Amino acid sequence: MAAFAQYTLSTGWYFKDRDELASEAWMPVPVVPSVVHQDLQANGKLKNPYVGFNELDARWVNEKSWTYRKILQKPTVLAGSRIVLAFDGLDTFAKVKLDNNIILESSNMFQAYRVDVTKALDCGDEHVLEIEFDCAMLRAQELRKQDPNHNWASFNGDPARMSVRKAQYHWGWDWGPVLMTAGIWRAVRLEVYSTRLADLWTEINLDPTHKTASISAFTELESVDLDPSYKVKFTITLHGKQIAQAEATPQEGRAKVEFNIDQPCLWWPHGYGDSTLYEVSASLNADQLELHRVTKKIGIRTAEVVQRPDKHGKSFFFRINGVDIFCGGSCWIPADNLLPNISPQRYRKWIQLMVAGRQAMIRVWGGGCYEDDSFYEACDELGVLVWQDFMFGCGNYPTWPELLKSIEQEAIYNVRRLRHHPSIVVYVGNNEDYQVQEQAGLEYNYEDKNPENWLKTNFPARYIYEELLPSVVERCSPKTFYHPGSPWGDGKITSDPTVGDMHQWNVWHGTQEKYQIFDTLGGRFNSEFGMEAFPHLSTIEYFVENEKDKYPQSHVLDFHNKADGHERRIATYLVENLRTATDLETYIYLTQVVQAETMMFGYRGWRRQWGDERHCGGALLWQLNDCWPTISWAIVDYFLRPKPAYYAVARVLNPVAVGVRREHHDWSITHAQPPKTSKYELWVVSSLQKPASGKVELRFLSVDTGREIRERIVRENVDIVPNGTTNLITDGLIDHTVDAEPHVLAARLWVDGEIVARDVDWPQPFKYLDFADRGLEVKRVSEASDQQVFQISTEKPVKCLVFEERDGVKFSDSAMDIVPGDVQTVKVTGLRADEKLKYKFLGQ
């Protein structure tokens, strides 16, 4: 009887073009996991595809098949033990051979595979392990041809991609390149054991009073033979201290125990409480010998999606531990086109950025991958809620029996792998597949509840989203809410703002509405919306090699923006709102101002609507991140450099925030006339769970002089509604015949004597304003080894003061509006005392 042992097979690999027969064709692989693009670069056979036009020079890789090989040393094995090759991820069509005998053929990138090789390793100590990766691009095209009757309607990439269970963005998306990876993209191990714990999971019931919680812990055993002496000891620890222990004898390959926890420490999203994690361990023992131990971290919490009829239609919001949570956050795409590039440390930095930006939820988008364990662990530990799409995006997927079987296995594997993470609060069937159904005119009768009928329509993928996937979630993670698609709402048209979630793309795409009215375009939960912006100059300098190409309309910059019609759309929003410029640095800044303003107008209004009977339950911007250095909708670029929009969103999501806005006057319509009056509104939003009291001030400041043009408004002892909205002024009026000069509305909020929030509403559009001679002063007032403090003041209102983003330098705030009589403070870490703080503001 042998204890479990494992050997990670990360080194000693070689690879080659499968069709190359010469022995010298083999090249070393630095480390596994890897994909072929990384290994080709390491051997000097491929230029960095992220630089210049190198993506085009890498296209040949997409059409090749590859072979990986390793000499395998047989481990020491006790009698009665089993030897298993475990593959956590093979990308994608893989034929695994051991000593030239096929032991596995796989066709799903999202599954793990296990192969018993005990007998295969019987003879000899050295064995040849080979993995042939067939070309996924060509295989997809072949599969598509085999089903000409299927309607292959889709957005983005080759429609043939839908026939293959591989990350769909590898075929290219409107923010990323076409890089068809292949390889051992997740770990491969050799495991030796007589018995192992194949799974450990829990079912948690939290009493409504939160005073007690019951935890049922389960293990599943995989064994050569189930010895009657086997015992499984379960332990629960909190902060390193054991708080409970129980033992069980396996029955029919499973062991189960029950725990009752008094006064449990709950898991909360950040900003609402501690994200407490308990550690659950299971130890398999026989005759006092520990054979295998498995440990997982869990959180005690409840999570529900509240959908109930109301005056706005039907709600859609999240409730954690009985507390309603406004889910301000972002959508997440894979953080690299070459997935093994992403280290656990890099994942954590991304989630830390979310927390610092006060974002509560991240949506794992359905065209990427089920993320690495370290991603979800970071979300658990840092308190970020996860909206998890299944990996289907922008298409009408086929439903061949063998494909459905693979999809079911994929779903079971990943839901079982992820179900212990308290951060995951919803599984969603797909991204925008119902929108494809609508636009292509595919059959969808919501009233037909017979799944077999769905398979006979020209939209058979409905079977996946409304039958297959929900049944897997119900079996494997029954307390996690399932939503058929994003967007989706009770079978209604996906743009219906009264139900479910919606993707609002009529700013940027669609009708290209003014971003100033973004808040009027939302629904019950806005799970996608966005505006493009250039990344910082240092990022552009990474992929633009020649100085002569460093201008806004250069070919290489166009090439790195994959969005359809991107130049026209960016130009539209720039020309309508700002005085344009042609030098690259200013142009970059102007696009970032537009993105920041767009995100602010959307978030600010939708968060206010949270207080109106949960009219808006959340907003997830598109997108947080990039998969390569590019120009996109990301608010933080590939190198984790925040754009101004990141800071604008963080301010709007402050636990207590003040908002002020005047009604939008559209100057772009035919025969537009100056308004004689304008209405304005003033409000406070709070995510605090208890009432608070504050003071609110509203000043009216001339853009040209900085002077107050009318008497300020001050409200003392304002009772701030908890977890809602406090409307202070809903019928304010600006008389332009009296207050004719352009002026800002500058609001401040004090709580307990400290300024906790600001908001500034500006005359629109900015291009009509004169920003000359602002009298801005940025003064260093203190410095320490790890932090410097700057005070910022101005004589006249300043719009969007942005500090230069540098690696290793962090700002407590940026993209700030500064007004006279309101000195603001910014803390900077990572900046040397002898370094100059560089910045830019509108009109500079």
From Swiss-Prot:
<dbReference type="InterPro" id="IPR054593">
    <property type="entry name" value="Beta-mannosidase-like_N2"/>
</dbReference>
<dbReference type="GO" id="GO:0000272">
    <property type="term" value="P:polysaccharide catabolic process"/>
</dbReference>
<keyword id="KW-0119">Carbohydrate metabolism</keyword>
<comment type="pathway">
    <text>Glycan metabolism; N-glycan degradation.</text>
</comment>
<dbReference type="Pfam" id="PF22666">
    <property type="entry name" value="Glyco_hydro_2_N2"/>
</dbReference>
<dbReference type="InterPro" id="IPR017853">
    <property type="entry name" value="Glycoside_hydrolase_SF"/>
</dbReference>
<keyword id="KW-0378">Hydrolase</keyword>
<dbReference type="Pfam" id="PF00703">
    <property type="entry name" value="Glyco_hydro_2"/>
</dbReference>
<keyword id="KW-0325">Glycoprotein</keyword>
<dbReference type="GO" id="GO:0006516">
    <property type="term" value="P:glycoprotein catabolic process"/>
</dbReference>
<dbReference type="InterPro" id="IPR008979">
    <property type="entry name" value="Galactose-bd-like_sf"/>
</dbReference>
<dbReference type="InterPro" id="IPR006102">
    <property type="entry name" value="Glyco_hydro_2_Ig-like"/>
</dbReference>
<comment type="function">
    <text>Exoglycosidase that cleaves the single beta-linked mannose residue from the non-reducing end of beta-mannosidic oligosaccharides of various complexity and length. Prefers mannobiose over mannotriose and has no activity against polymeric mannan. Is also severely restricted by galactosyl substitutions at the +1 subsite.</text>
</comment>
<dbReference type="InterPro" id="IPR013783">
    <property type="entry name" value="Ig-like_fold"/>
</dbReference>
<dbReference type="Pfam" id="PF17786">
    <property type="entry name" value="Mannosidase_ig"/>
</dbReference>
<protein>
    <recommendedName>
        <fullName>Beta-mannosidase B</fullName>
        <ecNumber>3.2.1.25</ecNumber>
    </recommendedName>
</protein>
<keyword id="KW-0624">Polysaccharide degradation</keyword>
<feature type="active site" description="Proton donor">
    <location>
        <position position="432"/>
    </location>
</feature>
<comment type="similarity">
    <text>Belongs to the glycosyl hydrolase 2 family. Beta-mannosidase B subfamily.</text>
</comment>
<keyword id="KW-0326">Glycosidase</keyword>
<dbReference type="InterPro" id="IPR041447">
    <property type="entry name" value="Mannosidase_ig"/>
</dbReference>
<dbReference type="InterPro" id="IPR050887">
    <property type="entry name" value="Beta-mannosidase_GH2"/>
</dbReference>
<feature type="glycosylation site" description="N-linked (GlcNAc...) asparagine">
    <location>
        <position position="723"/>
    </location>
</feature>
<dbReference type="GO" id="GO:0004567">
    <property type="term" value="F:beta-mannosidase activity"/>
</dbReference>
<dbReference type="InterPro" id="IPR036156">
    <property type="entry name" value="Beta-gal/glucu_dom_sf"/>
</dbReference>
